[in-house]
């Protein structure tokens, strides 16, 4: 008799934040929802901190959120976990729940998504031991897999690669015209060449590379404008504004603040280059979002950005600590220009590897 596969997906956030990990969670929960119909799976999903859900991602999944109530989360996780064949954990901070369920049901399969910086930090001895013996680790990039192996001594054979993919509801743009309303909003003209970074601007991280871009701007033509977007804490905003002032870039840098998801497409179309020469990116979903809009990237060659850029096929990989190399790559990309045929080719290459359907096929293969 056929035994229905039961999956429990545990997350910290899925819909109430908009970072890279949350984008991954939204795609995963939509894939699991598809599998309920396609393979007759039973899927429960439980979020610790969410206070809302978006129904289009969860039509066939039993999704609950507990608004930060850890006791309620534990009770619901153990209840659903006692029946599940597979537990998928979206974050290392949920590992304790995998451990408890594994103690209750030793045959339960435990899968952990490993994104980047959150799992490169020092781990307690019990986490390292549990990861080494009882958990399948699905890393978002080759770099993240290597960091887990090197930092924690975990056998590389226990670590699988599942690159991130595009949102299931992202529609490839049919044309690559710059939006007039953003040109007007940011006081731009047809003569301006536009660099764009979308990142969390955090004083506690500072690995996204926008410092290097600001420094590189000093040697770039005066018609190059830099749009730096993302939520910033007060300390980091103050530091960035000082850099802009020190480099005399006040007329050439725009801090846009947080951009909601429904505005991102227009900003990717506005940009000539998406530039983020990071030093600690686990993957970088923004790189593939840019490419899906025909926008090439300049990224660092020392982290997971290499996977996102297909080792240079979706843009330029540079030493993220070398200002001259970053500036040179930007100049080279600007000289090429964003011709429609180039944008279309870039978009097609991106969709071939990172479309939602391809992401789902890769996910099912590992599952």
What kind of feature is each model-predicted range?
Residues 8-10, 189-208, 214-217, 227:
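Conserved donor-binding/catalytic core segment of Leloir-type glycosyltransferases
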Residues 45-50, 198-201, 225-241:
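Glycosyltransferase donor-sugar binding loop
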Residues 143, 165:
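Carbohydrate-associated surface elements
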Residues 238-259:
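Nucleotide-activated donor-binding/catalytic signature segment of Leloir-type glycosyltransferases, i.e.
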Residues 258-259, 266-271:
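Short alpha-helical donor nucleotide-sugar binding micro-motif in glycosyltransferases
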Residues 279:
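Aromatic "clamp/platform" in nucleotide-sugar-dependent glycosyltransferases that forms part
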Residues 296-299:
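Short hydrophobic beta-strand element within catalytic cores of glycosyltransferases
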Residues 311-312, 316-323, 332-337:
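Conserved acidic donor-binding segment of nucleotide-sugar-dependent glycosyltransferases
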């Amino acid at each position: 008799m056929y035994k229905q596969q039961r999956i429990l997906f545990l997350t910290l956030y899925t819909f109430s934040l908009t970072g890279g990990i949350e984008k991954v969670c939204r795609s995963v929960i939509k894939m699991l929802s598809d599998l309920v119909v396609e393979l007759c799976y039973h899927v429960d999903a439980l979020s610790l901190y969410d206070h809302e859900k978006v129904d289009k991602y969860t039509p066939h999944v039993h999704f609950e959120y507990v608004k930060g109530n850890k006791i309620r989360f534990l009770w619901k996780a153990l209840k659903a976990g006692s029946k599940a064949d597979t537990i998928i954990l979206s974050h290392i901070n949920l590992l304790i729940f995998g451990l408890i369920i594994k103690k209750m049901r030793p045959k339960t399969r435990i899968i952990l998504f490993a994104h980047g910086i959150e799992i490169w930090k020092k781990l307690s001895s019990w986490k390292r031991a549990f990861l080494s013996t009882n958990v399948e680790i699905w890393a978002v990039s080759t770099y993240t897999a290597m960091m887990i192996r090197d930092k924690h001594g975990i056998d590389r054979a226990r670590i699988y690669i599942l690159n991130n993919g595009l949102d299931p509801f992202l529609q490839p743009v049919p044309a690559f015209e710059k939006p007039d309303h953003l040109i007007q909003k940011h006081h731009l003209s047809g003569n301006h060449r536009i660099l764009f970074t979308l990142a969390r601007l955090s004083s506690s991280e500072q690995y996204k590379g926008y410092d290097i871009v600001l420094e590189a701007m000093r040697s770039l033509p005066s018609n190059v404008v830099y749009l730096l977007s993302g939520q910033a804490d007060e300390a980091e905003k103050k530091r960035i504004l000082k850099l802009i002032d020190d480099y005399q870039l006040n007329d050439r840098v725009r801090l846009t603040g947080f951009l909601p998801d429904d505005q991102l497409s227009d900003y990717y179309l506005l940009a000539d280059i998406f530039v983020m020469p990071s030093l600690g990116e686990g993957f970088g979903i923004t790189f593939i979002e840019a490419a899906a809009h025909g926008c090439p990237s300049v990224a660092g060659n020392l982290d997971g950005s290499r996977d996102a850029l297909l080792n240079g096929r979706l843009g330029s990989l540079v030493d993220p600590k070398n200002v001259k190399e970053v500036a040179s790559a930007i100049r080279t990309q600007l000289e090429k220009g964003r011709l429609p045929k180039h944008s279309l080719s870039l978009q097609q290459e991106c969709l071939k590897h990172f479309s939602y359907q391809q992401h789902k096929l890769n996910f099912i293969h590992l599952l």
